[in-house]
């Protein structure tokens, strides 16, 4: 079992119960899933780029990504409906906790010129989204084998009812928010 999951059960739940005066342990917000999304618009011209992006996402998450396809045709971007334009992975359970731990302890501190993550990136329902400009911050990616530096979106979906609860949940995990 991931250390962060044990930490959540033992300490975070108790801390949030007293902070928000919950009656039941089931009211305490928890991390439900983490979604990693990599948009590869250049895949229209070269299909190999999408394969490389999918391989990177597989290395980062430990799970095979789903290839996302264009929902509708856009002439300005030269894409047609059904063209593969990206890939995504949804992590839940044990893999999610292991990824979350690696994200907080290893990957985020390796971001260049890092001054903390914005606390304004909540969606109004306690879910947090962040963008990473380089996939090479993850130790699973071999810098020498990278064909192109590409970014990815990371969305942390929680059961929190408000941004305040979501922020308190992530702050309890020592999530590096900007002061």
From Swiss-Prot:
Source superkingdom: Bacteria
Residue ranges of coiled coil: none
SUPFAM superfamilies reported in the protein's UniProt record: RL5-like
Cellular-component GO terms for this entry: ribonucleoprotein complex; ribosome
GO molecular-function terms, A-Z: rRNA binding; structural constituent of ribosome; tRNA binding
PROSITE patterns hit by this protein: RIBOSOMAL_L5
Keyword Hydrolase: no
GO process terms (BP): translation
Record key words, sorted: Ribonucleoprotein, Ribosomal protein, RNA-binding, rRNA-binding, tRNA-binding
UniProt keyword annotation of Signal present: no
Pfam families attached to this UniProt entry: Ribosomal_L5, Ribosomal_L5_C
Subunit and partners: Part of the 50S ribosomal subunit; part of the 5S rRNA/L5/L18/L25 subcomplex. Contacts the 5S rRNA and the P site tRNA. Forms a bridge to the 30S subunit in the 70S ribosome.
Assigned protein family: Belongs to the universal ribosomal protein uL5 family.
Family matches, as NCBIfam families: PRK00010.1
Role summary: This is one of the proteins that bind and probably mediate the attachment of the 5S RNA into the large ribosomal subunit, where it forms part of the central protuberance. In the 70S ribosome it contacts protein S13 of the 30S subunit (bridge B1b), connecting the 2 subunits; this bridge is implicated in subunit movement. Contacts the P site tRNA; the 5S rRNA and some of its associated proteins might help stabilize positioning of ribosome-bound tRNAs.
Full protein name: Large ribosomal subunit protein uL5
Name of the gene: rplE
């Amino acid at each position: 079992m991931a250390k962060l999951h044990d930490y959540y059960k033992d300490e975070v739940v108790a801390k949030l119960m007293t902070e928000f005066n919950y009656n039941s342990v089931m009211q305490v917000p928890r991390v439900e899933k983490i979604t990693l999304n990599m948009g590869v618009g250049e895949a229209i011209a070269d299909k190999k780029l999408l394969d490389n992006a999918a391989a990177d996402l597989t290395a980062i998450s430990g799970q095979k990504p789903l290839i996302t396809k264009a929902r509708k045709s856009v002439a300005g971007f030269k894409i047609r409906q059904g063209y593969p334009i990206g890939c995504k992975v949804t992590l839940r359970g044990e893999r999610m906790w292991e990824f979350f731990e690696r994200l907080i302890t290893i990957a985020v501190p390796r971001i260049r010129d890092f001054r903390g993550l914005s606390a304004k990136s909540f969606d109004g329902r306690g879910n947090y989204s962040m963008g990473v400009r380089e996939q090479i911050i993850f130790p699973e990616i071999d810098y020498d084998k990278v064909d192109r530096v590409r970014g990815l979106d990371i969305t942390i979906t929680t059961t929190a009812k408000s941004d305040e609860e979501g922020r308190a949940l992530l702050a309890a995990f020592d999530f590096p928010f900007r002061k």
